[in-house]
């Protein structure tokens, strides 16, 4: 193979060796072939790269100039990949045990507004489980309320997720504007702080 002469003998030009212009075309052809097969039985290949690998000019044995970006491959059955992704996004779960001999509405009084979307019997328990979702439009927090089978005087409340908004029962104000001692039914916080009420931790 005849290589072009290098006008600068003190450096080696490798641009002729690094030809990656056809890489994208080749990869697209491979992905088209994979796409023609049955995805339910074939492994799935997912690839991501933000930049191309470009040519390098080596000016000395100790100095290189090579621009690369990481490539990530995820190989496996489609269902397995979905399970792995779901596992990474598991919600934050908190369980509280509250003594209450009245009804489950007491467990709803946590400072947030909830919308009931279901009720389901529990195997081996005379008490059903109630399902609620936060009524704030962009909040995905859910909670389940049920009586403890071993001790019906207690209610188990399971929270999934974390609220992305303050509690509606918390009033934000400037402390100079109000006499805080005269309004005992409210939980006050100063206007320049943004935190959740201790009465509604999740």
From Swiss-Prot:
Localization annotation: Nucleus
DNA-binding region: 103-168
Name this protein carries in UniProt: Probable WRKY transcription factor 59
Transcription regulation listed as a keyword: yes
GO cellular component terms, A-Z: nucleus
Origin: domain of life: Eukaryota
Protein species of origin: Arabidopsis thaliana (Mouse-ear cress)
Name of the encoding gene: WRKY59
Annotated SUPFAM superfamilies: WRKY DNA-binding domain
InterPro entries linked to this entry: WRKY_dom, WRKY_dom_sf, WRKY_plant
